[in-house]
Design a protein with these regions (language model features):
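Bacterial Sec-dependent N-terminal signal peptides
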Residues: 1-23, 243
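Aromatic (Trp/Tyr/Phe) and Gly/Pro-enriched flexible surface segments
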Residues: 20-137, 148-238
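Aromatic/hydrophobic beta-strand junction motif of beta-rich domains
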Residues: 138-140, 255-267
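Beta-strand signatures of extracellular beta-sandwich domains
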Residues: 154-156, 276-280
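Short, aromatic- and glycine-rich surface loops/edge beta-strands on solvent-exposed regions
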Residues: 207-215, 314-325
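Proline-enriched interdomain boundary motifs that mark the N-terminal boundary
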Residues: 239-245
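Short, solvent-exposed loop/linker segments at the N-terminal edge
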Residues: 246-253, 270
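Edge beta-strands of extracellular beta-sandwich domains
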Residues: 326-337
């Protein structure tokens, strides 16, 4: 009985693949399950912040506008979401505002430039990141008194600076790597998938991510009682599939598939079934007729040792490796000696 050819490597060398990091950073407490100072006026989700931890000369005027809420998005296993809401303060509407950075209350006027959200490095008011996600996904529910009111989501991947998110801009200008800016009307629970816009021509060294939610797209507008629920935020890194086929140290009728999965295969806010890596073999490249020879339930890289059916021994054949949750496939020819 003849053996299959030795090692087929494609895309890049397997040893290099193993050396690459599978660490895809998420914003801590992305599911809003952990909270600090519960049932007090200083209640905030862990790693997220609102007016009660703000800075600036007018921060003492600000009141609580975020709270833990027991209404959660459809299908979640979590118990809590974050509720942000608007208030009327001395006749001025203060929009609900939640950020993983820090709020600054530098002006008495809602639209004042000194009222902003910012990254405060070397503190709890920042989130470090080492790459640029492809998109931000999150579940939201927005209710406003005026149907013309729009909520807003902003997220900035930026360089090594105390980056400031401003109305209609950001500072420092040359520190932006990627941006999400999205406005939306009142809605019941909805999962949003928001792609990051590339700004690496300004800065290509990501260090932090600053993400914020507000009940109105314009400061000082909207009505007291407008509210947004936020749940299960998840950064998406588009997945890729690579692999090698190896029959060293295998029996003559076996082949070992080493597959490398990178990126987000099964986002926890999408309620997908478990991802499966499936290996099939066929005599034709179109796989009109094929036999499954391996399967594993996993989201991460690994190996599958497959038994080759007798009908394929001594013939040229094709092997397909595919995933289910984020459909990807690779087809390679195995040439028999």
């Amino acid at each position: 009985m003849k053996r299959f050819l030795g090692i087929l490597l494609f895309l890049i060398v397997v040893s290099d693949l193993r050396a690459q990091s599978d660490d895809y950073i998420q914003i801590p407490n992305y599911d809003f399950e952990k909270w600090n100072n519960v049932n007090t006026k200083n209640e905030e989700p862990d790693s997220w912040h609102s007016f009660k931890t703000s800075t600036g000369p007018f921060h003492y005027l600000l009141m609580q506008q975020v709270e833990r809420h027991t209404e959660t998005r459809p299908g979640t296993k979590g118990k809590f979401s974050a509720r942000i809401f608007s208030r009327s303060i001395v006749g001025i509407t203060a929009n609900g505002n939640l950020t993983n950075g820090r709020l600054n209350a530098g002006s008495m006027f809602p639209a004042g430039k000194k009222n902003n959200n910012y990254t405060q490095r070397d503190s709890e008011f920042c989130t470090e990141i080492n790459g640029i996600p492809d998109s931000l996904t999150v579940w939201v529910r927005l209710r406003t008194k005026d149907e013309k009111s729009y909520g807003r989501i902003m997220s900035y991947v930026h360089g090594d600076a105390d980056f400031v998110c401003l109305t209609g801009g950001w500072e420092p200008y040359d520190m932006l790597c990627a941006q999400v800016e999205y406005e939306f009307p009142s809605t019941e629970w909805k999962r949003l998938s928001l792609p990051f816009k590339d700004y690496t021509h300004l800065c290509d060294e990501p260090r932090y991510i600053l993400t914020s939610f507000t009940t109105n797209k314009r400061a000082g507008e909207g009505d007291a009682g407008d509210e947004m629920l936020v749940d299960d935020l998840y950064l998406i890194y588009n997945p890729s599939l690579q692999c090698s086929i190896n029959n060293e140290n295998c029996a003559t009728d076996e082949v070992e598939i080493e597959y490398i999965i990178k990126g987000t295969m099964s986002p926890p806010n999408l309620n997908l079934p478990d991802n499966e890596v499936i290996v099939t073999i066929s005599l034709d490249e179109d796989f009109k007729d094929y036999v499954e020879i391996g399967r594993k339930t996993t989201d991460i890289s690994g190996t599958i040792k497959c038994k080759i059916p007798k009908a394929f021994i001594g013939k040229n054949c094709f092997v397909k490796v595919q995933t289910t949750n984020y459909p990807m496939e690779i087809i390679r020819k195995i040439r028999e000696l």
